[in-house]
Structures are given as structure tokens and as C-alpha cells.
UniProtKB/Swiss-Prot annotation:
CDD domains: KH-II_30S_S3 (cd02412)
Function description: Binds the lower part of the 30S subunit head. Binds mRNA in the 70S ribosome, positioning it for translation.
GO biological process: one example: translation
Taxonomy of the source species: Bacteria, Pseudomonadati, Chlamydiota, Chlamydiia, Chlamydiales
Superkingdom, natural source: Bacteria
Protein name: Small ribosomal subunit protein uS3
GO molecular function: mRNA binding; rRNA binding; structural constituent of ribosome
The organism of origin for this protein: Chlamydia trachomatis serovar L2 (strain ATCC VR-902B / DSM 19102 / 434/Bu)
SUPFAM superfamilies per the UniProt record, alphabetical: Prokaryotic type KH domain (KH-domain type II), Ribosomal protein S3 C-terminal domain
Family: Belongs to the universal ribosomal protein uS3 family.
Amino acid sequence: MGQKGCPVGFRTAVTKKWRSLWYGNNQEFGKFLIEDVKIREFLKKKPSCQGAAGFVVKRMSGKIEVTIHTARPGLVIGKKGAEVESLKAELKKLTGKDVWVEIAEVKRPELNAQLVADGIAKQIERRVSFRRAMKKALQSVMDAGALGVKVQVSGRLAGAEIARSEWYKNGRVPLHTLRADIDYATASAETTYGIIGIKVWINLGEKKAVPAANHAGAASTAAA
């Protein structure tokens, strides 16, 4: 089933860490889960978080800590930290709890599936040929040291009347191998012909299993 399921969810607690770190009883779990989704959806819409690769939510004694993984930390922090303070205030208003925001820089954006997918989406929205955008992304990912990469786009490609899917692949992308560190992400491009969906798989090599202490009992959502 490695071909059908989400590669990140498939490997969570095996070689991937949880993206939500908290404990919740039967009464709290649903509330916390919905709150996590709201936080992520809110951050995705913020202009300062457009270059974000993902968000990790931690909870402890009535407080929430949100770690924003981004290739452009200066954009999230803002002038003299003004943007971060604004995010804290807005998140506190959204959740009703004290929220601490941490910034984690993505050192190699070419090897991050979310950033690669977002880059392809932006190029398609700027009317760059989807094939050219895909091939350019493949080349940059492989040049950065990946063992394999696959990119797929779906929709009314180049304004075609009938929607279809096209994909390009370079190297190895073993989706069934749990020890393979596969990064996966999706994005969408809004064009005059409709929505174009983008999927990216990147093989970063083999990885040891995540220690049990990092995930035992933690609740998670797979949405980034």
C-alpha cells in the first residue's frame, strides 16, 4: 500500500516525527485536533509564512508552542521582530491561549518537498510551461544531493479541455521501503483554466527509526 497512502503518514513514528506533540484525553483530543488544524490553516494564509515548509504544534500546561520551518526566517520574523509579535497576538486571539512562536530555518530548501511543490505552483501561476517547471525542479533536487525525485501535475494542463496527469521521475523513490526517508508534499496552482494539483516525492536516503521516546503517546495530525 506504499503507492496509495501518504508517504509521510505511512512513516510517522517510524522514521518521521509527529507534527503535533501533545497528550489529550477523550474529552480534549477532538478539541485539540481541530485547534491544530485552525492554527495551520491560519498560518498558511499569512503572507509572512508563504515560504514555510511546515508547522509543528506543541502543548504544555495551557500554553501552545508553534515552530515554523521556513527557508526565509527574516520574512517571518519581520523588522525588529514585529511580524512574530503580530503572529503571537493573532494566534492568541484565535485559540484563547498563550502562544509562543519559534522559527526554524530550512537549510536546504531544494530538498524540502513542500518548498519544491510551492515553487512549481508559483511558476505555473506565472504561466511558465508546466513541463519546464517540473524538469527544472527535478534537476535542482538531484543537484542538491537527493537519491531520487518524482513530480506529478494534474488538471487542465496547458488549458486542455480534458484534465490529465503527467509526471517525471529521476533516480529511485522506493515508497514501500519504510526505512527510506521519503519527503512528500502537495500544492495547488490557480490558473485561468482551473486548479492544477502538484505532488512531489523526494528520496533523501535511508534513515534510522525514530526513538520511541520521541513519539510514544503523542497525538498527531498529518496535515502540514
